[in-house]
A protein has these predicted regions:
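Conserved functional acidic sites
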Residues: 1-204
């Protein structure tokens, strides 16, 4: 589990990430792939505003693949599923407006290098995201702790949103992000202890 604190336009936004116990199957070149589902729950000023579910799979070489995102938005009375997409056929539990993508995305390498470019979302005009590694080997300090060997990534889109800078820690994922007028930081994580242990091992 991971918990983030986001400050936006004078309001406090809390995001809670957990992996659900069940997996979801997808096909890659005719081969079934079991994906773990990351659920992100977002609260604004204590009110639930969005839940998204994101199936992920990791290849033997460490590459991370992204297969879909199902969005349930609760602001303004709820019922909005804008931005939902998946690879393959929809299931009864998927939002009816879910867009179909031709292939999986988010081919995030196991060891990103400076200048690497990858796309976690590639289905414009529904979703679009391009990530560029801007820096590596960073130590980043957030309320959840200090994380060594982080990478800095610039996230851009053709859909009009502002560029976003994100910092990722190995074995944890995103720990910090920043756009004009908005900042998010990891404040608690069940992965943090492992990161601290790894850091101690590196020092020894």
């Amino acid at each position: 589990m991971k918990v983030y604190n986001r400050q936006k336009e004078g309001k406090v936004d809390v995001v809670v990430d957990i992996f659900l116990p069940d997996t979801r199957m997808f096909q890659v070149d005719g081969t079934p792939v079991a994906c773990h589902v990351l659920q992100e729950t977002e609260f604004l000023d204590g009110q639930l505003i969005e839940i998204s579910r994101n199936p992920l799979a990791q290849a033997d070489d460490g590459t991370l693949y992204y297969f879909s995102e199902a969005v349930d938005t609760y602001q303004g009375g709820g019922g909005d599923h804008e931005g939902s997409w998946l690879v393959g056929d929809t299931e009864p539990t998927d939002p009816p407006s879910t867009a179909n993508a031709p292939a999986h995305t988010g081919d995030i390498p196991a060891s990103p290098a400076l200048g690497d470019v990858f796309k976690q979302e590639d289905l414009a005009p529904i979703v679009d995201e391009t990530d560029t590694v801007e820096d590596v080997g960073l130590t980043v300090h957030v309320p959840a702790g200090s994380f060594p060997n982080c990478i800095q990534v610039l996230e851009t889109t053709t859909l009009g949103d502002k560029p976003e800078t994100k910092w990722y820690a190995r074995g944890v994922g995103p720990i910090k992000s920043k756009t004009p007028g908005e900042k998010s930081e990891l404040i608690a994580s069940t992965f943090a202890a492992a990161a601290v242990t790894q850091r101690a091992a590196d020092i020894v």
